[in-house]
Amino acid sequence: MDQLRQSLLEAPIIEKGDYEYFVHPVSDGVPVLRPELLREIVIKIIRKVEVDNVDKIVTPAAMGIHISTAVSLMTDIPLVVIRKRQYGLEGEVSLSQQTGYAENEMYINDVRDGERVLVLDDVLSTGGTMRAVLDALDQIGAEVVDTVAVIKKAGPNELDESDHDVKTLINVRVTDGTVVIVDSNGDG
């Protein structure tokens, strides 16, 4: 059974202003994240990317952490979390994260020029977070081997015109209070 697809079809919908927002264990931490769903996601990610050529997994805090940790455990690839807190460590790079909902500063540590990275996140919506992360990694000189978002919300995003391709596991949209599956195989 396709746990990810089914869980999205059953996801509660809330309204934030004029925006319909699905509440999902992958993107929000509620309802409860079942281990079989997380396992399915990790297996799909590992099958979709070339993990043999990756030095580090990079993910923005907070909702990419559980997915990236599970992938790290399965592949033995070290994990770097892009934090919202500045530590002032040598080599720390700041980036400005702008989403459809908020704007924040984030900080990358422990990624160096020439390192090959896999970027993972929970959802690709406006593309603001992913664009900022990829631009910062380019600035550092890291080689982005692959980029994966578990769920893509259909519609234009900031990466449509970029040089970076983002693979996804499933593409959805929310219409009239319901999650609609646009592509059950995602992009890439």
Curated annotation (Swiss-Prot):
PROSITE patterns: PUR_PYR_PR_TRANSFER. One of its GO terms (biological process) is purine ribonucleoside salvage. The keyword Transferase applies. GO terms for molecular function: transferase activity. It is an enzyme of class 2 (transferase). Pfam families: Pribosyltran. It comes from the Archaea. Belongs to the purine/pyrimidine phosphoribosyltransferase family. Archaeal HPRT subfamily. May catalyze a purine salvage reaction, the substrate is unknown. NCBIfam families: HPT_Archaea (NF040646), PRK02304.1-4 (NF002635). This is HGPRTase-like protein 1. It comes from Haloquadratum walsbyi (strain DSM 16790 / HBSQ001).
